[in-house]
């Protein structure tokens, strides 16, 4: 079938790249479609210490670069195009992008998840102007300044420690009276002299004229609010939000079975409720969202897609 791919992968994080590698190596005509940038959430990770075989100096971007090179080496195609609709019911699946339409015998959904917003006034208006969701991207903008980190899980605390390499002081703002991060991570954080903690608190509002100038915090126990102002010398300060992610599955609603949170439901073979459609990585319902599990998902999904195509399409 001319202009019909054996495998189309939507998304290019670790799951999508692993799927592209396995699909291309299996001699499937493979295309990977990405709407923003290759790499997914891992590109904002300054250190990848829990991926087997990664060296101490491994960063998210460097790992993604090697994965992409591998997929390209085996012939996987890549296009940058934002997907606006999908038709997954037919034997030939149709993926509609802003630039073009793509047809495939099988599809892997690997769109991942996006950072969850704090949801306070001023946050979106001042994103990129003091508000950030990426320590690796923006830490150096706050050299020797004060920074607030919203969140208390593994990512929040790890990124706070990274930010402490640049900032004069880092305050972790957490809704509870204890961190949710792993104990080993907590131990490191409590020993870091640059880290401070604002317990039982939430950020209520972010203010500024084109740049973050102040922020209002609320104690959730007492109800008391406190406004922090940038000092005159700095002129601003950083607010980094790390409170989890939201699945990027809006385009698949009504087309595929999702759970209440919007994650795609699959079986152990990454199969969705639609024949020939698989899901991999952070977009699907799973107990652990890490690079290593995303890669495993991608490999399984591509292998199952290969079997599906062989069983349902003639040469």
Curated annotation (Swiss-Prot):
Subunit structure as annotated in this protein's UniProt entry: Homodimer.
Example of a GO cellular component annotation carried by this entry: cytoplasm
Gene that this sequence comes from: trxB
Cofactor notes: Binds 1 FAD per subunit.
Keywords: Cytoplasm, Disulfide bond, FAD, Flavoprotein, NADP, Oxidoreductase, Redox-active center
Family under the similarity heading: Belongs to the class-II pyridine nucleotide-disulfide oxidoreductase family.
Reactions catalysed: [thioredoxin]-dithiol + NADP(+) = [thioredoxin]-disulfide + NADPH + H(+)
Positions bound to FAD: 34-41, 282-291
Signal peptide: none
Subcellular location: Cytoplasm
GO MF terms held by the record: thioredoxin-disulfide reductase (NADPH) activity
Enzyme Commission number, as recorded: 1.8.1.9
GO BP terms in the entry: removal of superoxide radicals
Cofactor: FAD
Domain of life: Bacteria
Protein name: Thioredoxin reductase
Listed PROSITE patterns: PYRIDINE_REDOX_2
Entry-linked Pfam families: Pyr_redox_2
Misc: The active site is a redox-active disulfide bond.
UniProt entry tagged with the keyword Cytoplasm: yes
Coarse class of the protein's main subcellular location: cytoplasm
PANTHER family in the record: THIOREDOXIN REDUCTASE 1-RELATED-RELATED
Disulphide bridges, residue numbers: 134-137
